[in-house]
Amino acid sequence: MSYPADDYESEAAYDPYAYPGDYDMHTGDPKQDLAYERQYEQQTYQVIPEVIKNFIQYFHKTVSDLIDQKVYELQASRVSSDVIDQKVYEIQDIYENSWTKLTERFFKNTPWPEAEAIAPQVGNDAVFLILYKELYYRHIYAKVSGGPSLEQRFESYYNYCNLFNYILNADGPAPLELPNQWLWDIIDEFIYQFQSFSQYRCKTAKKSEGEMDFLRSNPKVWNVHSVLNVLHSLVDKSNINRQLEVYTSGGDPESVAGEYGRHSLYKMLGYFSLVGLLRLHSLLGDYYQAIKVLENIELNKKSMYSRVPECQVTTYYYVGFAYLMMRRYQDAIRVFANILLYIQRTKSMFQRTTYKYEMINKQNEQMHALLAIALTMYPMRIDESIHLQLREKYGDKMLRMQKGDPQVYEELFSYACPKFLSPVVPNYDNVHPNYHKEPFLQQLKVFSDEVQQQAQLSTIRSFLKLYTTMPVAKLAGFLDLTEQEFRIQLLVFKHKMKNLVWTSGISALDGEFQSASEVDFYIDKDMIHIADTKVARRYGDFFIRQIHKFEELNRTLKKMGQRP
């Protein structure tokens, strides 16, 4: 699906001051107006601690120095330099360490100073203020009790428009570089705030008439088309799909990067936008399109682009979930098992930063639940350490699911699925109380229908494992089914155990039909003939692989020892 560039421009060109001013926010109720004015005065004239002033000035100087250096590099037709890399590293330290520590100390549950309050200290630097506001509103969404007001949701949207406008509509590459972690967080937060607003606007019960009028008169703010257009524009500007295509075929991505894609800012925003599109299409329930946007990303191979752990985890979570909903259980199990093993081995790395740990830990728990569902519906062998974790966490629930308990399926699905949303602006004159739950209930129904179709398969599988031949009528009697009903269930078993499975190639949509079922059968007249297809584990191959790895490591160490 393509989105015209002029659509994006019309959305992105919003004037940040175009929304109603202070007077328009008055309600006519003296008590409410007085409370609003007190809050406004409190925000405008708050005293900024000296340490925060010094930090903001240092932050501004670091960003300004980087921009000045980037301007010089662009004029000299250079992509980057050691000076730029050093400045990006300094900004990363500010972003990941200083900002977090000061937030914890001064603004744990309250907002940072407004951009207007710090503007004089940074010389009203427009670019820095946009970046500052991005952090400011993100903090309000994450930590401030009560969350963002309607006005703050709109202001944050306009600020993102200004940021993407600066990056996408400049005459030539924008003179800016940011750490990969911050670039990922920008895309991640942009989609999160859209998701949050989509659910917020559907909950009309506690909204005043003024807020309802405000929502009615601004249907294009946080509109799904503007969000999609931003992501597609970043993908197109960076030429990231062509770069990935060349990279995966062993070529040099720089050769096809183009004027913008050569720069880290555009390249990484383009890559992260692909993951953003994966997430957005999954939230909208379009799983085929979700995986299709990643057709040039080889998931089963380490990449130079996968340097941000949260991006890796998010990618695998949404790809795995999309596979699950597309009934590609074997692929879903492979994806979940791979990323859970990765998290298991690198967990200590995330514990250094609390906010990263919380996010990754939550998705880790959700993926365990989804893996439990997938393995119940499609039993197959997985890594022993992951299987052990799964038995500890969900052993009891997996047994109940195997017995066909729909309540457990629903419970785990509700806990582990994404927060689905509707792209359509609701009819504010007639919104029923549970309107915001409709996208979730629709996806739950699709999933529950699939579970219902497979309700008998676990029992049939356990009976088939006991015999090699058996009259169809006799086995039907064991299951309290008529012969005709049993034959239908056997056909369902054959159909559901056959999956489209990825075997090779770059696109995650590629695959061939396979069955990983441990039993197979055929019917000859009135007799069912059963074969155990379970392959005994070949330990010899495992040890041979480990010996080869050890020998390769030994050779590498010897070469390192020979260096002067």
UniProtKB/Swiss-Prot annotation:
<feature type="modified residue" description="N6-acetyllysine">
    <location>
        <position position="465"/>
    </location>
</feature>
<comment type="similarity">
    <text>Belongs to the eIF-3 subunit L family.</text>
</comment>
<dbReference type="GO" id="GO:0033290">
    <property type="term" value="C:eukaryotic 48S preinitiation complex"/>
</dbReference>
<dbReference type="InterPro" id="IPR019382">
    <property type="entry name" value="eIF3l"/>
</dbReference>
<dbReference type="GO" id="GO:0005852">
    <property type="term" value="C:eukaryotic translation initiation factor 3 complex"/>
</dbReference>
<dbReference type="GO" id="GO:0001732">
    <property type="term" value="P:formation of cytoplasmic translation initiation complex"/>
</dbReference>
<keyword id="KW-0648">Protein biosynthesis</keyword>
<keyword id="KW-0007">Acetylation</keyword>
<dbReference type="GO" id="GO:0005654">
    <property type="term" value="C:nucleoplasm"/>
</dbReference>
<dbReference type="GO" id="GO:0006413">
    <property type="term" value="P:translational initiation"/>
</dbReference>
<comment type="subunit">
    <text>Component of the eukaryotic translation initiation factor 3 (eIF-3) complex, which is composed of 13 subunits: EIF3A, EIF3B, EIF3C, EIF3D, EIF3E, EIF3F, EIF3G, EIF3H, EIF3I, EIF3J, EIF3K, EIF3L and EIF3M. The eIF-3 complex appears to include 3 stable modules: module A is composed of EIF3A, EIF3B, EIF3G and EIF3I; module B is composed of EIF3F, EIF3H, and EIF3M; and module C is composed of EIF3C, EIF3D, EIF3E, EIF3K and EIF3L. EIF3C of module C binds EIF3B of module A and EIF3H of module B, thereby linking the three modules. EIF3J is a labile subunit that binds to the eIF-3 complex via EIF3B.</text>
</comment>
<dbReference type="GO" id="GO:0003743">
    <property type="term" value="F:translation initiation factor activity"/>
</dbReference>
<keyword id="KW-0396">Initiation factor</keyword>
<dbReference type="GO" id="GO:0045202">
    <property type="term" value="C:synapse"/>
</dbReference>
<comment type="function">
    <text>Component of the eukaryotic translation initiation factor 3 (eIF-3) complex, which is required for several steps in the initiation of protein synthesis. The eIF-3 complex associates with the 40S ribosome and facilitates the recruitment of eIF-1, eIF-1A, eIF-2:GTP:methionyl-tRNAi and eIF-5 to form the 43S pre-initiation complex (43S PIC). The eIF-3 complex stimulates mRNA recruitment to the 43S PIC and scanning of the mRNA for AUG recognition.</text>
</comment>
<dbReference type="Pfam" id="PF10255">
    <property type="entry name" value="Paf67"/>
</dbReference>
<dbReference type="GO" id="GO:0001650">
    <property type="term" value="C:fibrillar center"/>
</dbReference>
<keyword id="KW-0963">Cytoplasm</keyword>
<feature type="domain" description="PCI">
    <location>
        <begin position="331"/>
        <end position="537"/>
    </location>
</feature>
<dbReference type="InterPro" id="IPR000717">
    <property type="entry name" value="PCI_dom"/>
</dbReference>
<dbReference type="GO" id="GO:0016282">
    <property type="term" value="C:eukaryotic 43S preinitiation complex"/>
</dbReference>
<protein>
    <recommendedName>
        <fullName>Eukaryotic translation initiation factor 3 subunit L</fullName>
    </recommendedName>
</protein>
<dbReference type="GO" id="GO:0075525">
    <property type="term" value="P:viral translational termination-reinitiation"/>
</dbReference>
<feature type="modified residue" description="N6-acetyllysine">
    <location>
        <position position="549"/>
    </location>
</feature>
<feature type="modified residue" description="N-acetylserine">
    <location>
        <position position="2"/>
    </location>
</feature>
<dbReference type="GO" id="GO:0005730">
    <property type="term" value="C:nucleolus"/>
</dbReference>
<dbReference type="InterPro" id="IPR011990">
    <property type="entry name" value="TPR-like_helical_dom_sf"/>
</dbReference>
